[in-house]
Regions:
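Transmembrane alpha-helical insertion/packing segments
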Residues: 1-67
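Short, charged juxtamembrane terminal tails flanking transmembrane helices
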Residues: 1-6, 171-184
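Alpha-helical transmembrane spans of integral membrane proteins, capturing the lipid-embedded, hydrophobic core
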Residues: 14, 18-26, 53-58, 87, ...
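Transmembrane alpha-helical segments in integral membrane proteins
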Residues: 63, 145-176
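Membrane-helix interface/capping segments
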Residues: 63-82
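Short amphipathic alpha-helical coupling elements at transmembrane boundaries
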Residues: 79-86, 123
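Functional transmembrane-helix hotspots
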Residues: 100-127
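Short membrane-interface loop/juxtamembrane segments of multi-pass integral membrane proteins
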Residues: 123-145
Length: 184
């Protein structure tokens, strides 16, 4: 019964934090676009972009660590494998949220932005490639949302799972008499 409670708590927490992480990553897309719209380019824009990326990167690591520690404190009988599974669930759910948003952004929200960027790329590349290759690249635009979803989902999930593995090793359960290496 206690393991079912831990599993239920784990999914509830993962859903909440998955939405938060996915929201942070989705908002970061628009911060980059806002910088372009405000013409924050050049050295200052690059530095600001790096600072924002660093803040997002470190902030997400700290937030993941906080979520895992809080779960450990709220569920004293949770072992390290439970804490890792929480992180894994957060990673997969946030990857799902972010990937879905990225596809919606490409297909519905910022269609003109992506169309203009893709047209610019095709125009520049067409100067060096044969016409047949250029036509094949134009046909890839139809599949861009699919590739974006799959690529983002795999990358974000793997990154989050590795991060969860690393962080869960440093978050012991509250009960020193529980064998933390045991899989339940």
């Amino acid at each position: 019964m206690e393991q079912n409670t831990i599993r239920s708590n784990r999914w509830n927490e993962a859903a909440r934090y998955g939405l938060i992480f996915g929201g942070i990553s989705s908002a970061y897309i628009y911060l980059g676009r806002l910088m372009v719209a405000l013409e924050l380019t050049g050295t200052f824009g690059s530095i600001l972009s790096f600072v924002l990326w660093t803040a997002k990167f470190i902030g997400c690591i700290k937030l993941m660590q906080y979520a895992m520690r809080k779960f450990s404190q709220d569920n004293p009988s949770a072992v390290r494998s439970d804490i890792f599974r929480l992180g894994r669930n957060i990673a997969v759910l946030s990857a799902l949220v972010f990937s879905t948003f990225a596809v919606a952004d490409i297909m519905y929200i910022s269609t003109e932005y992506y169309q203009a960027a893709y047209t610019t790329i095709i125009t520049e590349i067409s100067k060096t490639l044969p016409a047949q290759n250029v036509e094949e690249m134009k046909n890839m635009l139809v599949d861009l949302p699919k590739y974006t979803f799959i690529g983002n989902f795999i990358y974000c999930s793997l990154y989050g799972i590795v991060l969860s593995f690393i962080l869960s090793r440093n978050i012991p359960s509250q009960n020193p008499f529980i064998n933390n290496t045991e899989e339940q």
